[in-house]
Amino acid sequence: MGKRIGLLGGTFDPVHIGHLRGALEVAESMQLDELRLVPSARPPHRDTPQVSALDRLAMVECAVAGVSPLVVDDRELKRDKPSYTIDTLEQMRAELAADDQLFLLLGWDAFCGLPTWHRWEELLQHCHILVLQRPDADSEPPDALRNLLAARSVSDPLALQGPGGHIAFVWQTPLAVSATQIRQLLASGKSVRFLVPDAVLAYIDAHGLYRAPN
């Protein structure tokens, strides 16, 4: 039986309990051997991160230290070009055994935006896609995705077979936390305790991140 590896990318600017709790729930429900959090360097579809790649990486490392099966994968930060998910999947797939399963975790909004991604039609050649369902996900997917869902979706995520090729929806506890909200609180001098892990808060405080200049 091959390994089951999950992949959750993001700017993690900063990483917060929404990312982490969702990741842990999926890792447990999907019985993953490993769930890799992959900080992105210069994501083509997102605004430029507010703090450096090294700080974002350090915060994710603080957040998952000792929390199995969550681990950090820093490969995208080592690239000197835009950070495309397809490149990461190709690289990871080449490192894994033929019977290992790779699962790409995507929030509903990111999933709906897939047709704008670089070489998006090739993603399922390398992995299964797990769409993290939220109760407020009421927007309709574009036509290209509706066709893909009709052809590739599986109702039971645990029934996904083979190294890749299918899509399933996974429930996660809704936590109305966003990195934008956390940055705004910090910039206005307010506390973000209990929105980020204590180790991340200590790092933010020690390095004066996200604070408005005096």
From Swiss-Prot:
It comes from the Bacteria. Pathway: Cofactor biosynthesis; NAD(+) biosynthesis; deamido-NAD(+) from nicotinate D-ribonucleotide: step 1/1. One of its GO terms (biological process) is NAD biosynthetic process. Its EC number is 2.7.7.18. It is an enzyme of class 2 (transferase). Coiled coil: none annotated. It catalyses: nicotinate beta-D-ribonucleotide + ATP + H(+) = deamido-NAD(+) + diphosphate. Keywords: ATP-binding, NAD, Nucleotide-binding, Nucleotidyltransferase, Pyridine nucleotide biosynthesis, Transferase. One of its GO terms (molecular function) is ATP binding. Catalyzes the reversible adenylation of nicotinate mononucleotide (NaMN) to nicotinic acid adenine dinucleotide (NaAD). Belongs to the NadD family. This is Probable nicotinate-nucleotide adenylyltransferase. It comes from Pseudomonas fluorescens (strain ATCC BAA-477 / NRRL B-23932 / Pf-5).
